Amino acid sequence: MEQQEEVPPPPAGLGLTAEEYAQVRATVEAHHRYAVGPGQCSSLLAQRIHAPPAAVWAVVRRFDCPQVYKHFIRSCVLRPDPHHDDNGNDLRPGRLREVSVISGLPASTSTERLDLLDDAHRVFGFTITGGEHRLRNYRSVTTVSQLDEICTLVLESYIVDVPDGNTEDDTRLFADTVIRLNLQKLKSVSEANANAAAAAAAPPPPPPAAAE
C-alpha cells in the first residue's frame, strides 16, 4: 500500500489551520519562498477576508493607488513609461511609482517597481528600488486565494536587508507590524466593497400592498 505524502504543518505564527495551509501550500512554495542570505530577513503573513477573491484582488492589484489600503502612504504617482508612448495608467511589470510616506516613520519617499501582476492567478509583486528610507532591497509578493465560498486568504511575504545597527528581529518586527495593519485595512475595504456590490445587485423590495 502506497504511503501518502505527509503534509508539513503551517509555519509558526501564520495563524492557519492544517487544512487551510494544505489548500495554499502550492502557492506558498511557488511564490513565498526566498533564498535568505546573511544580513537579510524575511517573513510571511496571512489575512482571512470574508469577501470574494475578485473583490480582494481588485484592491490588491492597484499598483497605482496603494493608499487605498496601505496606512502610511500619503500619495502615489506613476512614473511615465519609457517603453510606451501612451504614458497612461496601464499597469505592466517594470512600471515605477513614487510613493510619499506620512511623517512619523523612518522614511519619506520610496521608489517602487512593479515586478509581477498576474490577474489569472492573483499574484502581485514589487521591489523597492530607491527613495529615502531604510528598507534596502525590499521585495514583496502578495497572493489572493479562495479558501471557501465566503472566505478569501491573502498571503504577503517579503525579503529585505537588515539595516546597519538593527537586528533581524527588529527589522522583522517593524515590517510585520506595518503589513499586519495594511492587511487589516485591506480586509475592511474589501468586505465593505463586497457588501456594497451585493446590496446594489439585490433586487428591489416588492412595493407595499395597496390598502383595500
UniProtKB/Swiss-Prot annotation:
Subunit structure: Homodimer. Interacts with PP2C53. Binding to PP2C53 is dependent on the presence of abscisic acid (ABA). Interacts with PP2C50. Binding to PP2C50 is dependent on the presence of ABA.
Keyword Iron attached: no
GO MF: abscisic acid binding; protein homodimerization activity; protein phosphatase inhibitor activity; signaling receptor activity
UniProt main location, coarse: cytoplasm
Motif (Gate loop): 103-107
Domain of life: Eukaryota
Single biological process term from Gene Ontology: abscisic acid-activated signaling pathway
Phylogenetic placement of the source organism: Eukaryota, Viridiplantae, Streptophyta, Embryophyta, Tracheophyta
Record function comment: Inhibits the protein phosphatases PP2C06 and PP2C09 when activated by abscisic acid (ABA). Together with PP2C53, SAPK8 and SAPK10, may form an ABA signaling module involved in stress response.
Region (START-like): 34-191
CC per GO annotation: cytoplasm; cytosol; nucleus
Pfam families, per the entry: Polyketide_cyc2
Source species of the chain: Oryza sativa subsp. japonica
Binding residue positions for abscisate: 70, 107-112, 134-140, 156
Name recorded for this polypeptide: Abscisic acid receptor PYL10
Motif Latch loop location, chain numbering: 133-135
